[in-house]
């Protein structure tokens, strides 16, 4: 989340609270999808299926610090390990935002050149993976540091 954009385009006296809440929600989703991926890897590893309700509840409850009922162990699944795609997208989102800020400044969102970069990057739809998109920008593939820094900065504010 770009704090400058939020401050410029959002009204109200509780912007810091909003940024903190949004960041905590994102952190929750990151932890949830990482836990889902871990569980799905275990589920599809060919192990004992009778252990999976307990594994599901244990993994998600540990990751999120709230109890998850065992009954959802087959409902809370995405096809083809799609949880991994979400995680990669969130990682790349932070990388891309960082790239645009480094290239155009803190108000990168305000420049037409930013839109041109984004149009060029995404004009082919889903032809490219996030790794290929990062490579096209000259970035390291799936670098977690921008995401860590964004979360840390937003929670310290």
Where are these regions (language model features)?
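C-terminal, non-catalytic "cap/extension" segments appended to globular domains
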Residues: 43-157
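Acidic/histidine-rich catalytic neighborhood
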Residues: 1-41
